[in-house]
Amino acid sequence: MAPSLWKGLVGVGLFALAHAAFSAAQHRSYMRLTEKEDESLPIDIVLQTLLAFAVTCYGIVHIAGEFKDMDATSELKNKTFDTLRNHPSFYVFNHRGRVLFRPSDATNSSNLDALSSNTSLKLRKFDSLRR
């Protein structure tokens, strides 16, 4: 069908929803005046609201067009297995592994020198970051 028909259907549905809301507000004010506040909405207002909502949703679904498939195979056809979970933005090269996996003789000599001078320890920390 023509897109203008679905837009018209949505317009009619929204108008019916607005009319149902106005009718509900009028009914509530009438119930306050008659001091019968514990009664519920009449069935015709409830049915009009539900029908208008269904008509509006039906029109909106037809205006939206074709939906995409939920199956991911159509989007993954042109990707290789290596690039599937490859996120280079998460690579970190400045980490503590360089200090942890240093040869043991360099670690022992740095520990002895660190005990001798506190200032050299601070400088050595910055040197390890520059390497």
Curated annotation (Swiss-Prot):
Family: Belongs to the membrane magnesium transporter (TC 1.A.67) family.
UniProt GO BP: cobalt ion transport; copper ion transport; iron ion transport; magnesium ion transport; monoatomic cation transport; protein insertion into ER membrane by stop-transfer membrane-anchor sequence; tail-anchored membrane protein insertion into ER membrane
Tissue: Abundant in heart muscle and kidney with lower levels in liver and brain and very little expression in intestine or colon. In kidney, highest levels in distal convoluted tubule.
Lumenal topological domain: 23-43
Matches recorded under Pfam families: MMgT
UniProt-recorded Gene Ontology molecular function terms: cobalt ion transmembrane transporter activity; ferrous iron transmembrane transporter activity; inorganic cation transmembrane transporter activity; magnesium ion transmembrane transporter activity; membrane insertase activity
Cytoplasmic side: 1-3, 64-131
Protein name listed in UniProt: ER membrane protein complex subunit 5
Transmembrane segments: 4-22, 44-63
Membrane disposition: Multi-pass membrane protein
InterPro entries, sorted: MMgT
Induction and repression of expression: Up-regulated by low extracellular Mg(2+).
First-listed, main subcellular location of the protein, grouped into a coarse class: endoplasmic reticulum
Tagged with keyword Phosphoprotein: yes
